[in-house]
Amino acid sequence: MCIRDRSEVVVYTGYMTQKKADLTGSVAMANASDLKKNASANAMKSLQGKMAGVHITTNGGNPAEGTTVQIRGLSSLSGGVKPLIVLDGMPTENLNLRDINSGDIESIQVLKDAASASIYGARASGGVILIQTKKGQAGKTNIEYNGSVSINTVLNKPTLMNAEQYGRAAFQAQAYDERVYGTSISLPSAYNYTWHRGDNGIAVLDEVKVAEYLNADQTVRGSDTDWMGEIFQTAISHNHQLTISNGSEKSKSLFSLGYFNNEGTQIHTFFRQYSIRANTEYSLIKNHLKVGENLAVSYLQYRDQSETWWAMINPPASPVYDENGGWAGAPGFDDFTNPVRLLTMNKDNINNYVKIIGNIFLDLNIWKGISARTQFGLDYGNAYNRAVDGVWSETGGRNSDGENYVGSYQSHPLSYVWTNTLSYTLSTGKHNLDVVLGTEATRFVQEGFSARREGIYLEDRDFAHIGVTTGEKYNLGSSADEYTYFSLFGKANYVYNGKYLLSATVRRDGSSLFGENNRYATFPAFSVGWRIKDEAFMEDFDFLSDLKLRASWGANGSVQGLPRGYTTTPFTTDYFGTSYPIQGNESGPLYSGYKRTWLGNPDLKWETTTQTDLAVDFGFFNQRLTGSLGYYFKKTKDILVQTPYIAVMGEGGEPWINGANMNNQGLEFEVSFRNDPSAEFQYTISANIGTYKTKLTELPENVINKYPGDGVRDFVIGRSPNVFYGLVADGIFKTQEEVDNHAEQPGKAIGRIRYKDLDGDGRVDELTDRTYIGTADPDFFGGITFDFKYRNFDLNMFFQGVFGNQVSNDWKRQSDFWHISGSVPVGKNHPTRLLDAWSFDNPDSDIPAMTNVMTNNEQRMSTYYIEDGSYLKLRNIELGYTFPAKITNKMMMKNLRVYASARNVFTLKKFWGDDQFTSFDPEMSGYGYLTPFTMTFGLNVTF
């Protein structure tokens, strides 16, 4: 955010505005220019690493642009407590930020502490994200076009074994098993092997070649397929937005059109967004009455299917197509699926979503600082999908489907919010007072329907609808949800003499989600501030331009973790266990009945988080150096947990209770420095760091076994719920002597993982030798931004990082193991890292020997999979040029800027030590959609 005089910056803080200088709470801010850098269809993705204490993670390179936002660590155990999103003053129930055009956003404020967020009460324990969209400005008529084209490609794909390497690895595993376990050599039929036995009787490979044909019909030719190369592509994305705005003293309006097409780097995947927005405002009766509306309509289409997993494990010897042009399987291997077929056959099964969101409002200036506002907001969504699955087979493979079907799904969430406020403003002498009182009523309704039917007469998508299928109907389903909130709230801000600040908030919320015993709760908050720099005794400190102390305490609630209806005992009709021969017939139809889903608890109440904040804001050298440092402590009580199954209660005997407590504390630091603004070469450096430490302080005894620990001697209490728990791997058995001298460990053998006997009883077992081996919580996270400007050129570089966390590297199960029971069946392909596995010819390797026999149980959680998840990424670098006015004036333009940018340029990770990260991206240690490198070329023009 550009640094301006503090008195100019006005911040929207929920139902009212304040000068930034008068803030006593913790608020992070971003404006439209911040969002343009590293622009994305999801605004929060653009802000990753740019706000202290706001931890944003992405879903890799998935074109559907999903993000997860966590403000100041965990606030619940349910995993469902997300920040409340407030759009143009309307709290939302079902808004994903990819649903709206990020180019329409004027500013984003994140309310981090309880004092700031408590005005939203029961839904604010996860923080609050306030979004204001752009409005027309008085006296200005602008036509603005922003457009860009991007090229996306995955540079950091895993390097997999080719066909020959796979064949050699298969032989190596068989030779090891024969020598260590005494098994006989059995090689894959897809290869022709030439081998002999050496003088010591050990199997020695001479040559391996892929068979010319993999099946007896000679329709599947042996190949050397790069499956990653087959499913990945260089993709082109487009982003275009046209905005027209104007205004006068009597009216202001803004109209925008947007189109975003993000083609995925996996074939036949994409995300498209079509958007339209109209924001208007009219002043009537000599400016005593103001009416207006904010309305946005978006239509989304997306296919976010990822087949990275199948591309990684499919044998390279199998081709994509058979000799007749049909889909090929994997003859001679295990049960595999052709990933190109999966992506191609589903390419027209598109997810569709329509979002209509907006509000109408009326402001009435009653008399001398007294005003009233009423606002009615609506948020409607319509999700629908029609999936057509045709008959298919993979030649030579084990997979086929002789049935076709059509499946349809629809869901219609609707929420509306009616907010009424009465405001009073008083400014006299040294006193400034702002008060707001209000009521808010919210209702959410959702209905959904799904159906699937076999027997498509004609496999043509235009024809294939459920109504014209001929098979039996099955998997009919429906869903419904409804709940309401009613709230009373008030807030007062008081400033004395421009330097003593006081704020108080209270909100009382009621929700139909709770039983009558605990339907209402009250959430208060208080905060104070002291602008020390404005004191007389600070006049001699000329180098100090700002110094303010802040302190706050407040309470927030959470209902997001509460499963719908868990205060009552619901019943359901399910496919299994609910149909009975009511008439006693031994044949004929079974009549559908009901079964209990869970046992209700009418005494469930709100999860409540109290939070204390202490902070200092500072500025030096006429605000050229600014920043803030803050500490917070959060305590959440009455956290919802589900108790274990109680057999005597029968089906659904798993009630929810308020039973857990948790503490969370951390530090936040922000700093920004700019050089002399009159210099020809200008630069600004901004950085932020956030930390959080989470500890569970209480769990019911009958629940504690559901969390890491053994439940006997080693408990999660006092630790984060995000810890990892397992055995300690102690290298590889490299000699038979090491095997013989080690503690009793079922399955131990030369070339296998050695586990520590922590309790010293001479036996490695799961009960007494597991311990805490890491945490997914980082030590700190943040980002640093460099902005440079020389004449008409500008350069922006943004680095983002996470440090001190551990990850469970799921890739390692493929890259380090030829076979793991239940996880990595024999026959799958692997990254080339496995070629360096331990063998009698490679005894110094720390990768376990390749084997088809797994008696050492190496798939279990241990430090072997726990690696350092720290990283530093150059997220974005952008070079722009703004044409001088003498050129743009001739072209009847107000502004013209062109730019080129690169996103996801490089990643630095730990590459040394026992806990080094051995895969390619610590941010995504699973098998998801790989993150692409993106080059963007764009144009901003204003008329």
Where are these predicted regions, by residue range?
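Residues within well-ordered beta-strands of beta-sheet-rich folds
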Residues: 130-132, 615, 670, 785-789, ...
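Extracytoplasmic gating/loop element in the C-terminal half of outer-membrane beta-barrel translocons
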Residues: 215-218, 228, 470, 511, ...
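Glycine-rich, aromatic-lined ligand/substrate-binding cores of catalytic
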Residues: 775-809
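Short aromatic-centered micro-motifs
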Residues: 85, 494, 756-758, 788
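Extracellular/periplasmic, surface-exposed regions of secreted and cell-surface proteins
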Residues: 8, 34-37, 81-82, 238, ...
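Short, small/polar-rich motifs associated with maturation and membrane association
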Residues: 4-278, 283-284, 290-292, 328-329, ...
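Conserved small-residue
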Residues: 144-217, 449-452, 564-565, 674-776, ...
